[in-house]
Structures are given as structure tokens and as C-alpha cells.
From Swiss-Prot:
This protein's GO CC annotations: cytoplasm; ribose phosphate diphosphokinase complex
Catalytic site positions: K192
Free-text comment on the cofactor: Binds 2 Mg(2+) ions per subunit.
GN (gene name): prs
UniProt name for this protein: Ribose-phosphate pyrophosphokinase
Organism: Helicobacter hepaticus (strain ATCC 51449 / 3B1)
InterPro entries in the record: PRib_PP_synth_CS, Pribosyltran_N, PRibTrfase_dom, PRTase-like, Rib-P_diPkinase, Rib-P_diPkinase_bac
Residues that hold D-ribose 5-phosphate according to the record: R194, D218, D222, T223, A224, G225, T226
Family annotation (Gene3D superfamilies): 3.40.50.2020
Lineage: Bacteria, Pseudomonadati, Campylobacterota, Epsilonproteobacteria, Campylobacterales
Enzyme Commission number: 2.7.6.1
Binding site for ATP: D37, G38, E39, R96, Q97
Cofactor(s) the protein needs: Mg(2+)
Record's keyword annotation contains Iron: no
Superkingdom assignment: Bacteria
Length: 309
């Protein structure tokens, strides 16, 4: 194995420590402070000369701070003689701004890709990009893992009598179909009409859910409006139970309250983002072992293809 070190930003140190533990190493030392005006100051606490470096930093809220911290850490490591710098970004912020949908708006996902690449990062390891084409915004290797691998294993522990996979909207059909095909289930679609940003209105169910145990799947749960309204409609159409699988628990604004009041029986997420508070309906699955295995294989010059579910 090549000599490597793992550093953690401040976004999710619990996750970083879990990844390091899976690899039987300790996180390398770094100090992250702020100047009196709020600017971020980073100091690397040990030699990295000639080493392969992995920085673990999801760019979740506050996205601007965590992204800037990642870039500054990268610059510090590059100037300290690191050989290769790999950014492990379990949740890739700004991924929803991947194209122009109205005039005179930015493509921020491309801008962020440019910033990451120009900072000196040689490889990005992420999971469930909101838009997979973002991989093409980079001219460096991007490994986009899938949370569905841990969801599949979790579903094996459930005793569903008549399960079926559902996409909460038309945009997620490809993701839901891929998951349904891999686990051998049929697919239904919840069609919705979006009234305004972060608000959704469920309109119709395409498929039969009467007496079924419905498994909603999406890449993220933000305000939870889509998932909760979908669950309510599915139950009204005769669904026996409804659980939601969402890789990234953004859970902003009224999300937790909506989940509590909704017809959702369970919400299953990963620890790609730190959960704000515990919630009786929310189950968190760890993807730290998955990321640790990717790091191990990269350091051994092994293929990571089998880890893409």
C-alpha cells in the first residue's frame, strides 16, 4: 500500500473518524481556526511530503464555509509537498445547479468543479450526485458511489409481503428504475407539479400500489415536501406501508416536522451529512465502510468497479 494520510475538515469529523477507524489508522493532524473577521485559517500539523492525501469534507450547510475550507486545506497540503490530493466529498453541494433552466442564471456545479480542480485536487470521491453528468464537469477522475448498496442490504432485514419501488417524481425515474431492477422489484411513479422552489404538489400515481409496501427512493431529502406528499397520496391509494430512502439527509427548514406528521412509516438515510437531531422515524445507515474500502483500493491500485451498485 502506498503511503497515505487522511485529513478531515470540520464538516463531519464523526464520519471522518469512522472512515479512519475502518482503515485502522488515525486522522492526521490539522488545525482549523478563524481570524477575527471570519476568514478561515488552516495549518497542517505534520509532514505530508510525497504522501497521497485524502481530505474528507462534505460540502453540506453551511456550504460556502465548508467548500472554502476544503479549498484552503488543499492549498495548504499542496504547498506542503503532498504527492496526490484526493477530495472525499460524501455530499457534493451545489449539485442542483447543473444547468440553465431559466435565463441569466449560473451553472454553479460547473463553477464548483472548476474551483476544486484548480485548487490542486487530483481526484474526487463522492456519492449520489444529484445530476450524474456533473462528473463530466471535471477533467480529473470522479468516483460517484451509490448509497443504494447500503439500502439494498438494509431492505433484506425487512419483512415486506408485497414490496414495490417508487420514484417520488419524474426526474428520479432513472434512479428508481435502476434500483428496482437491481433488487428485482417493479416500479411505480409519483407524478408531481412543482409550484415554486422547494415546494411540490403531488398530482398522480402511475402504477398500482394497493396493498403494496412502497419503497420511495431519491438522492436527497431536503425540505421533505416531495417525499411526504408522495407518501400521503400513496397511502390514500391503498399502500400498506411507505418508507423513504434518501442518501443525503439535507433536512432543511420544516423537513423534520413534515416527516413527523406525514404518512411515512420510516425514513432511511446515510451519514453522508451529519443529522441535526435524532428523529423517531429516521434510521441512519453508515457509508463510512464503503468510502474506506474505496480509499483502500485506490491506495492498492485496485479497481473500485465492483463497489458501484
Amino acid at each position: 500500500m502506498r503511503g497515505f494520510k487522511i485529513f478531515s475538515g470540520s464538516a463531519h469529523t464523526l464520519f471522518s473518524n469512522e472512515v479512519a477507524k475502518c482503515l485502522d489508522i488515525s486522522l492526521s493532524k490539522t488545525t482549523i481556526n478563524r481570524f477575527s473577521d471570519g476568514e478561515i485559517n488552516v495549518q497542517i500539523g505534520e509532514s505530508v511530503r510525497g504522501k497521497d492525501i485524502f481530505i474528507i469534507q462534505p460540502t453540506c450547510a453551511p456550504a460556502n464555509d465548508h467548500l472554502m475550507e476544503l479549498l484552503i486545506m488543499t492549498d495548504a497540503l499542496k504547498r506542503s509537498g503532498a504527492k496526490n490530493i484526493n477530495a472525499v466529498i460524501p455530499y457534493f453541494g451545489y449539485a442542483r445547479q447543473d444547468r440553465k433552466v431559466v435565463p441569466r442564471v449560473p451553472i454553479t456545479a460547473k463553477l464548483v468543479a472548476n474551483l476544486i480542480e484548480q485548487s490542486g485536487i487530483h481526484r474526487v470521491i463522492t456519492m449520489d450526485l444529484h445530476a450524474e453528468q456533473i462528473q463530466g464537469f471535471f477533467d480529473i477522475p470522479v468516483d460517484n458511489l451509490y448509497g443504494s448498496i447500503v439500502f439494498r442490504d438494509y431492505l433484506k432485514t425487512k419483512s415486506f409481503k408485497n414490496p414495490i419501488v417508487a420514484s417520488p417524481d419524474i426526474g428520479g425515474v432513472a434512479r428508481a428504475r435502476h434500483f428496482a431492477d437491481r433488487i428485482g422489484m417493479d416500479l411505480v411513479i409519483v407524478d408531481k407539479k412543482r409550484e415554486r422552489a422547494n415546494e411540490s404538489e403531488v398530482m398522480n400515481i402511475i402504477g398500482d400500489v394497493d396493498g403494496k409496501d412502497v419503497i420511495l427512493i431519491d438522492d436527497m431529502i431536503d425540505t421533505a415536501g416531495t417525499m411526504c406528499k408522495a407518501a400521503d397520496v400513496l397511502k390514500s391509494r391503498g399502500a400498506n406501508s411507505v418508507i423513504a430512502l434518501g442518501t443525503h439527509p439535507v433536512l432543511s427548514g420544516p423537513a423534520l416536522e413534515r416527516i413527523a406528521k406525514s404518512a411515512l412509516d420510516e425514513v432511511v438515510v446515510t451519514n453522508s451529512i451529519p443529522l441535526r437531531v435524532a428523529h423517531p422515524k429516521i434510521k441512519v445507515l453508515s457509508v463510512a465502510p464503503l468510502f474506506a474500502e474505496v480509499i483502500r483500493r485506490i491506495c492498492h491500485n485496485e479497481s473500485v468497479n465492483s463497489l458501484f451498485f
